[in-house]
Amino acid sequence: MIAREGSNSRKVFIKTYGCQMNVYDSVRMSDALAKDGYVQTEDMGEADLVLLNTCHIREKAAEKVYSALGRLRDMKKSREEQGREFMIGVAGCVAQAEGEEILRRAPAVDVVIGPQTYHRLPDALKRVRRGERVIETEYAVEDKFEHLPVAEKATLRSRGVTAFLTVQEGCDKFCTFCVVPYTRGSEVSRPVRQIVDEAMKLVDAGVREITLLGQNVNAWQGEGPKGEKWGLAELLYRLAEIPGLARLRYTTSHPRDMDDRLIGAHRDLRILMPYLHLPVQSGSDRILKAMNRRHTGEEYIQLIEKIRSARPDIAMSGDFIVGFPGETDRDFEDTMAMVETVKYAQAFSFKYSTRPGTPGADLTDQVAEDVKAERLERLQALLLRQQKEFAESLVGKTMDVLLEKPGRMPEQLIGRSPWLQSVNLDAKTLKIGDIVNVRITATGPNSLFAEVAGS
């Protein structure tokens, strides 16, 4: 048995790639390992266990993981020469998608564990210490959330005043470009009781804002106290009743699951922030059909208008893919026209990346890389202009800002606007966790500047 130095506590370093759900999963893995004697560290050099929580959405993300594993191999060799324990684990969607291939390409890896089996991680590490190389990537019959512990109050409090809370996993939409149904599985909703209990623990520990997470979060379904069917709207109304919870958000949504009840929740609940991430991917009906999005561009625009009618102060965010197989200049111009029509406060855009195992990978009319790059540059310039215009429209206006963390300057705090922007504020008498009414005085490249209203 390889020895450990120092204290009785083992140390784990977790590197998180990709989406907010991976951030949430990393936190829950850390909590599970804490029950097994692990303390999380931000210094990889002092870790006994390194976990890479991976993303498989784009090809470059997966290759980053293999590059990191190459560096970890050398670290492991050095540790073993010193007689010290050092284990390497790959978690997340690359683990789910590639499984045995990871062990083949990176022999230094000890454990490969998919997103549905994180609750088995402590047991997997025990098996590694017995000499096994472990793969846990099957979809578990048991509910992982029932088995993943929530951290103690003191630990939760140390994590800040905002928190993610996963309520739904997986996706049944099978968009032709996307690996999520293959790496996260079909749509599964957490029970109301689990969600409310976790939310109450977070609020009790000082959390003021909770963001509900799901690959397709507005497909969440549950059962109310009288056995009635609940959707995300009913869950939001229930969470809004928790004393001390000041703000709610949710992401990511699919246009087809944006029903009237959910739109009504945006109208009724001031606790629900006026910001909605609603990906569309393309403005071309032909490409939307090829992507299996199951809605048209016009239907998406009409949905946006309906949402804005219910909540006039709402700001929209979205996702776009350029260069999907078969995308013509006309198709791309349809996307540009949609962006001009919707006017996004923020949006994310990417070149299409072929993902093995998806229907899009089998299409032959791939778009040339230089064409993708040119289109992406044009789209991002338009989106950046809209983002700046939205930020500038807030100058001189007042809003409530949740103070989250210290700023770079003395006596400066950084808060979050209702529309998810960072807000820099001189706050001598204020503290983290306060919600303060401010007046926006200026914009920066990626943030706003403000003063306390009335000062």
Curated annotation (Swiss-Prot):
Cofactor needs: [4Fe-4S] cluster
Q: Which reaction does it catalyse?
A: N(6)-dimethylallyladenosine(37) in tRNA + (sulfur carrier)-SH + AH2 + 2 S-adenosyl-L-methionine = 2-methylsulfanyl-N(6)-dimethylallyladenosine(37) in tRNA + (sulfur carrier)-H + 5'-deoxyadenosine + L-methionine + A + S-adenosyl-L-homocysteine + 2 H(+)
Q: Where is the signal peptide?
A: none
**Occurrences of domain Radical SAM core (ranges):** 157-389
MF terms per GO, please? 4 iron, 4 sulfur cluster binding; metal ion binding; N6-isopentenyladenosine methylthiotransferase activity
Q: Which Pfam families match?
A: Radical_SAM, TRAM, UPF0004
Provide the binding site for [4Fe-4S] cluster 2. 171, 175, 178
Task: List, alphabetically, the CDD domains matched.
Answer: Radical_SAM
Q: What class of enzyme is it?
A: transferase
Q: What is its EC number?
A: 2.8.4.3
User: Which residue intervals define the domain TRAM in the entry?
Assistant: 392-454
Q: Which SUPFAM superfamilies match?
A: Radical SAM enzymes
Q: Where does [4Fe-4S] cluster 1 bind?
A: 19, 55, 93
Keyword Nucleotide-binding attributed: no
Functionally, this protein is described as follows: Catalyzes the methylthiolation of N6-(dimethylallyl)adenosine (i(6)A), leading to the formation of 2-methylthio-N6-(dimethylallyl)adenosine (ms(2)i(6)A) at position 37 in tRNAs that read codons beginning with uridine.
Q: Which PANTHER family match?
A: CDK5 REGULATORY SUBUNIT-ASSOCIATED PROTEIN 1, MITOCHONDRIAL TRNA METHYLTHIOTRANSFERASE CDK5RAP1
What is the official name of this protein in its record? Answer: tRNA-2-methylthio-N(6)-dimethylallyladenosine synthase
Please tell me the species this chain comes from: Agrobacterium fabrum (strain C58 / ATCC 33970)
